[in-house]
């Protein structure tokens, strides 16, 4: 398998293809617990490596339900798509210190919903940056959404990879998710006291990932994650909510692999 992957990578160069399929016990999307049942997610990227000018490509992210819990609301397979152009750039700051940037303009599509209002499309801009170094890696994400989902989402945290044995490694990370008042309402719901949410942190998550790098082209991973809603008012609002996945704290996990050509 390794020889086949290397052959495919050499044939594609300077073009690239990355595929990451995974199964998760639950699905958290931009700080909101969207589904507390198993989901299948696939992330695909393809493009051209322009060397010093970065990597130009396109991305596609799709979500499928692995249960029939919401069969009356939407179809099971591929009911949520995200796609758009991407640009990745690595800026070397010093020996072993690199600022990694990932910028995208994407569209989110929902399909197969019985409710016509849910069969909608909206667009967004997003930037991800991480300061890769041998110690602790800080990272953040900013997303600005448009067309009916007008909100700003922000995520920031730190992670650290520890080698265990040869190609086996573990990566603990912690991050907070926040955004504008519109994003807060999207995540938490309406306040129980009738007041308007202000901008702020809505949740904090702790993640532990175990990975095995079989080759430069193939790796597998498993993770466990603890999701926690922050703030007394937010917890009260979620406790009073009729939303099917209204949980103030939730433990989830998943398995997957990463293929790079």
Task: Tell where the protein language model's regions lie, with residue ranges.
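Outer-membrane pore/translocation modules
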Residues: 60-157, 240-247, 251
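Outer-membrane beta-barrel transmembrane domain signature
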Residues: 43, 48-56, 94, 132, ...
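Outer-membrane beta-barrel pore domains and translocons
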Residues: 22-28, 61-65, 90, 102-110, ...
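Outer-membrane beta-barrel and related beta-rich outer-membrane complex signature
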Residues: 33, 70-72, 113-115, 184-186, ...
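Short glycine/proline- and aromatic-enriched beta-strand/turn motifs that initiate or cap beta-hairpins
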Residues: 11-70, 252, 258-260
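Short glycine/proline-enriched turns and hinge-like loops at secondary-structure junctions
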Residues: 34-37, 119, 150-152, 168
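Outer-membrane beta-barrel biogenesis signature
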Residues: 4-18, 30-32, 159, 166-168, ...
């Amino acid at each position: 398998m390794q020889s086949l992957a290397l052959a495919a990578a050499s044939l594609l160069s300077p073009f690239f293809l990355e595929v990451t399929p995974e199964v998760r016990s639950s699905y958290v999307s931009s700080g909101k617990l969207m589904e507390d049942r198993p989901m299948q997610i696939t992330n695909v990227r393809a493009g051209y490596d322009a060397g010093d000018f970065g990597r130009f490509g396109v991305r596609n992210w799709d979500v499928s339900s692995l249960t029939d819990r919401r069969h009356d609301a939407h179809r099971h397979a591929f009911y949520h798509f995200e796609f758009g152009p991407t640009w990745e750039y690595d800026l070397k700051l010093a020996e072993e210190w690199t600022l990694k940037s990932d910028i995208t303009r994407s569209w989110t599509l929902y399909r197969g919903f019985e409710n016509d209002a849910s069969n909608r499309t909206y667009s967004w801009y997003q930037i991800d940056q991480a300061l890769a170094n041998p110690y602790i890696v800080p990272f953040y994400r900013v997303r600005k959404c448009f067309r009916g989902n007008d909100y700003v989402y922000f995520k920031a945290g730190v992670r650290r990879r520890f080698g265990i044995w040869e190609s086996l490694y573990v990566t603990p990370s912690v991050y907070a998710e926040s955004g504008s008042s519109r994003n807060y309402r999207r995540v938490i719901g309406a306040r129980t006291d009738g007041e308007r949410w202000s901008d702020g942190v809505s949740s904090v998550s702790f993640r532990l990932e175990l990975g095995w790098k079989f080759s430069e082209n193939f790796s597998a991973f498993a993770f466990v994650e603890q999701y926690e809603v922050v703030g007394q008012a937010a917890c009260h609002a979620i406790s009073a909510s009729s939303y099917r996945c209204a949980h103030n704290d939730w433990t989830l996990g998943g398995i997957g692999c990463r293929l790079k050509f």
